[in-house]
């Protein structure tokens, strides 16, 4: 299985980079992980809704260019479905059983994701109503992917 994380914005914080590297290393037993960082658009102060939509559309075009035609796409969106860890693990397993070998997770920039990217998604997923920096969300997501594989293995990691 191949897991791709497409993210908008550059990760600068060393502690987050180290955490993501650790979970990527742990996941290498189960899958290949690729992190794709895309440039985020500069948002003017007091930007209008139209300007925000244009920014999300431009970011969306860059995201779309990195999605494979046969990828199962999961976007992180506040309006998405929330999963307990066990159910998320089952969902990833079901995706693989249904013939998808490439799963792409997408984390948008500070404005979120364009409508086009949300429409391309096979699944919209949410980690709740909290607002988190998208850089921190990368670490949370990759830890949950690792946890999902450990649940599938019956590992005590999840306990």
From Swiss-Prot:
GO terms for molecular function: rRNA (pseudouridine-N3-)-methyltransferase activity. S-adenosyl-L-methionine binds at residues 76, 108, 127-132. Pfam families: SPOUT_MTase (PF02590). It is found in: Cytoplasm. Coiled coil: none annotated. SUPFAM superfamilies: alpha/beta knot (SSF75217). The keyword Heme does not apply. GO terms for cellular component: cytoplasm. It catalyses: pseudouridine(1915) in 23S rRNA + S-adenosyl-L-methionine = N(3)-methylpseudouridine(1915) in 23S rRNA + S-adenosyl-L-homocysteine + H(+). The keyword S-adenosyl-L-methionine applies. Keywords: Cytoplasm, Methyltransferase, rRNA processing, S-adenosyl-L-methionine, Transferase. Its EC number is 2.1.1.177. Homodimer. PANTHER family: METHYLTRANSFERASE, RIBOSOMAL RNA LARGE SUBUNIT METHYLTRANSFERASE H. Specifically methylates the pseudouridine at position 1915 (m3Psi1915) in 23S rRNA. This is Ribosomal RNA large subunit methyltransferase H. It comes from Leuconostoc mesenteroides subsp. mesenteroides (strain ATCC 8293 / DSM 20343 / BCRC 11652 / CCM 1803 / JCM 6124 / NCDO 523 / NBRC 100496 / NCIMB 8023 / NCTC 12954 / NRRL B-1118 / 37Y).
């Amino acid at each position: 299985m191949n897991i791709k994380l497409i993210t908008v914005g550059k990760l600068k914080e060393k502690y987050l980079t180290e955490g993501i590297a650790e979970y990527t290393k742990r996941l290498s037993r189960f899958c290949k992980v690729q992190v794709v960082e895309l440039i985020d658009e500069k948002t003017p102060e007091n930007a209008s809704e139209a300007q925000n939509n244009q920014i999300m559309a431009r970011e969306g075009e860059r995201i779309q260019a990195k999605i494979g035609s046969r990828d199962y796409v999961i976007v992180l969106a506040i309006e998405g479905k929330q999963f307990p860890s066990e159910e998320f693990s089952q969902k990833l397993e079901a995706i693989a059983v249904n013939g998808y070998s490439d799963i792409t997770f997408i984390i948008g920039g500070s404005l979120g994701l364009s409508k086009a990217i949300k429409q391309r998604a096979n699944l919209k997923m949410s980690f709740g109503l909290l607002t988190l920096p998208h850089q921190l969300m990368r670490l949370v997501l990759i830890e949950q992917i690792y946890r999902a594989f450990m649940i599938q293995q019956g590992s005590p990691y999840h306990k």
